[in-house]
């Protein structure tokens, strides 16, 4: 697995079975070009090309990459009122979302086909007057396989995004294996994970740095970290047989 824009972090995933082939996946860590969807899609195409140059077969983009994750924005919303400035900001955000299917979807599909990679793309989907946080799936032949809409937006996300209804929990058979996705906090929801397990979702891949200690908006369970700075005696480990032999020799 490689991480674009962090060149020092590159780990190749190897299956447990010696007979299985190696899959190289790329996690894209990049920002949206806010309120400029064409520029964001241009950037996505460049990143897909860069991932393919690494030899990747699968590229996974961030939540809401096309359309943007508006971290820190409140869109002027308080209980009982919305400011004019906030309304204008939401108008721009709504205009930056994409229709699914639509021209932006076609461009990502074309890039997947051109570089022969599978892509999972985070987008803000516009459906009528509702926005959804959505993951789109593409295979290496450039086919748009389908989508997953985030079921339960977190906290203030519920002001700007609609709720998925459970009808978009796909797992797709592809040439590199079965692909599915959950978005952000959904990975902490046991029933959603169980729904994927029930569809024979072969393997769950989560980054080893998933534990976030810097205050991610969706980690209320992390209240504080306490560090014991007092020196402690070192702990050594040995086999049970060696420990017994040492004890017997001391008793002789």
Name each model feature, range by range.
Residues 1-252:
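Enzyme catalytic cores with a strong preference for nitrogen-chemistry domains
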């Amino acid at each position: 697995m490689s991480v674009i824009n962090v060149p020092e972090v590159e780990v190749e995933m190897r299956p447990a079975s010696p007979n299985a082939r190696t899959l190289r996946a790329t996690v894209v860590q990049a920002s949206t070009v806010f309120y400029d969807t064409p520029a964001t899609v241009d950037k996505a195409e460049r990143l897909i090309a860069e991932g393919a140059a690494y030899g990747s077969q699968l590229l996974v983009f961030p939540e809401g990459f096309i359309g943007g994750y508006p971290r820190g924005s409140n869109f002027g919303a308080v209980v009982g009122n919305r400011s004019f400035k906030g309304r204008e900001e939401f108008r721009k955000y709504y205009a930056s979302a994409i229709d699914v299917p639509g021209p932006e979807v076609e461009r990502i599909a074309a890039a997947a086909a051109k570089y022969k990679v599978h892509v999972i793309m985070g987008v803000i989907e516009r459906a009528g007057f509702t926005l959804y946080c959505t993951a789109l799936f593409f295979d290496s032949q450039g086919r748009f396989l389908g989508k997953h809409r985030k079921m339960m937006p977190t906290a203030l996300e519920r002001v700007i995004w609609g709720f998925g209804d459970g009808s978009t929990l796909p797992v797709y058979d592809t040439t590199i294996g079965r692909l599915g996705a959950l978005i952000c906090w959904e990975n902490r929801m046991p029933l959603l994970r169980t729904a994927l397990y029930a569809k024979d979702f072969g393997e769950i891949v989560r980054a080893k740095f998933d534990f976030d200690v810097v205050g991610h908006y969706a980690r209320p369970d992390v209240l504080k970290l306490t560090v014991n700075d007092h020196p402690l005696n070192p702990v050594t480990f040995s086999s049970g047989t060696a420990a017994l032999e040492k004890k017997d020799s001391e008793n002789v």
